[in-house]
Amino acid sequence: MSQETEKDLEQTQNEELVEEAQSDEKKDQEVDPVEAAQAEAAEYKDKYIRAHADFENAKKRLEKDKMNAVAYANESFAKDILAVLDSFENALSAIEGANKENAAEVLEKMQEGVKLTYEQLKKVLEKNSIKEIESKGTFNPEVHQAIMQVDSDEHKTDDIVQVMQKGYTIKDRVLRPAMVSTAK
């Protein structure tokens, strides 16, 4: 055989070996469709399990936050009202120190202290969206509760004559209706 023929033969054999190796690689790379589907299903199942666990954890966290919000909803109000309590305690201790000689002075200071404490309490209520219900004019059953009716030449029927107990709202909700007497 000539050298060229020998080279051609060798080159052809090399090409056949390369093609055979590539064919074997393709066969190795080709995956059974059932196995591929099973692997994909397993991957989706794993993702589902993780997502479900994340969802359940978030749900538990939200429930805990909700319970804490309900349990401590009035914490801010309670802190504010403690200052009013302190004022009352100071007033009571001032009374304990009173005697006949300083009774007038203590009474005057008590009156001033009660006024200041009243204003302090009103500010706490206002800060917490608690407002007094306006109880002048015509009776409104949504915010007033009629305790009695009285004869009155000065007022029209269903006009409020007297407020027995003030009413209050918290935001837009009636906390306690105003107790009133109305004209017949």
UniProtKB/Swiss-Prot annotation:
GO terms for biological process: protein folding. Coiled coil: none annotated. SUPFAM superfamilies: Coiled-coil domain of nucleotide exchange factor GrpE (SSF58014), Head domain of nucleotide exchange factor GrpE (SSF51064). One of its GO terms (molecular function) is protein-folding chaperone binding. Residues 1-38 are annotated as: Disordered. Keywords: Chaperone, Cytoplasm, Stress response. Residues 1-10 have a biased composition (Basic and acidic residues). One of its GO terms (cellular component) is cytosol. It holds the Pfam family GrpE. Its main location: cytoplasm. It is found in: Cytoplasm. Participates actively in the response to hyperosmotic and heat shock by preventing the aggregation of stress-denatured proteins, in association with DnaK and GrpE. It is the nucleotide exchange factor for DnaK and may function as a thermosensor. Unfolded proteins bind initially to DnaJ; upon interaction with the DnaJ-bound protein, DnaK hydrolyzes its bound ATP, resulting in the formation of a stable complex. GrpE releases ADP from DnaK; ATP binding to DnaK triggers the release of the substrate protein, thus completing the reaction cycle. Belongs to the GrpE family. Homodimer. This is Protein GrpE. It comes from Sulfurovum sp. (strain NBC37-1).
